[in-house]
Curated annotation (Swiss-Prot):
Expressed by the venom duct. One of its GO terms (cellular component) is extracellular region. This is Conotoxin Cal6.26. The keyword Lyase does not apply.
Length: 64
């Protein structure tokens, strides 16, 4: 029983770590630095928004 609980916890921890690492790697690969709601007015719109796009050259908005 203890071994089963330990294995379940280990799988959950590894899954969470993988998701966090995957998100960080995605941001690094895209070289993005703006989050939704951040102003992208002075940016040329080439991937600066980490999620979504630069809407009307004003703010980053998340994809729907």
């Amino acid at each position: 029983m203890k071994l089963t609980c330990v294995m379940i916890v280990a799988v959950l921890v590894l899954t969470v770590c993988k998701v966090v690492t995957s998100d960080q790697l995605k941001k690094l690969r895209r070289e993005c630095y703006l989050e939704p709601g951040d102003s992208c007015f002075h940016d040329d719109g080439r991937g600066a928004c980490c999620e979504g796009t630069c809407l009307f050259g004003i703010n980053c908005v998340a994809s729907w």
